[in-house]
Amino acid sequence: MVQVNQTKQFLRFKFIKRGSLQYISHLDLVRTMHKVIVRAKLPLWYTEGFNPKPKMIFAAPLSIGTESECEFMDLRMNEYIDPSEAMARINANMTSEMQITEAYYPESKFTDLKWMSYRLSFTPVEINDDLVNLCNEMLSLDTVEVLKKNSEQTMNIRPLIKSALATRVGDSIVVDAVLSADPSAFLNPEYIVKYLKDKCGLLSHPDLTAEHYEIMRLNAYFGDMTEFR
């Protein structure tokens, strides 16, 4: 049984963010969650001062345009509340595109989160086995170089990729990848998209509406690849 610190107790919520909500910014997510948890009438701990706010901490914020089955938020409570009761109160104020799936008092910290799994789905104009094989060849290289964001410098993201495998699924190429989620070395899955576009020609059709891709975050892990919670 988890021993809850009565003086500083955080309740952890795992939640999904799908559909149109993939396009809201992290700041908008924080604002939305703030409204929801206030409506849920949870026994929240508030900061002191002229503008008291509840203590909310999020793990590995997503980029705009990424769906997720695995988001985490820690809320500091002023007193104990049963996790299932807290989850029910919050979900009553949520849409189907964002729902709490688990609530519990954690024994881990967000700094213990080391890996996250993703599914990247590409729908090119033309698909064949050679293109799938090329994706796997490029992803298996010892050096996987991409341009840094807003920079002309390159970086090798190979150490931040635990695994990445491309397969053909119907008219799509699906890449299942486990990427670093370490707060000091977080790898945005958009870098995998950028790399495959540059090296394999994915998403390079002159008609920008002809091809598309989707990213779904699936799960989170400790350093030993046991499920994070």
Task: Label each region the model flagged.
Residues 45-75, 107-109:
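Short, charge-patterned binding micro-sites
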Residues 8-9, 14-16, 20, 24, ...:
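Extended, well-folded interaction surfaces typified by the phenylalanyl-tRNA synthetase beta subunit core
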Residues 85-94, 130-140, 192-193:
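Short amphipathic alpha-helices in soluble, non-transmembrane regions
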Residues 69-119:
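Ordered, amphipathic secondary-structure segments that act as subunit-interaction surfaces
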Residues 140-229:
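Core RNA-modification/binding signature centered on pseudouridine synthases
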Residues 20-22, 30, 34-48:
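Short Lys/Arg-rich amphipathic alpha-helical segments
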Residues 11-13, 73, 115-122, 173-180:
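Short, hydrophobic beta-strand segments
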Residues 78-83, 124-127, 182:
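Helix N-cap motif at beta-to-alpha junctions
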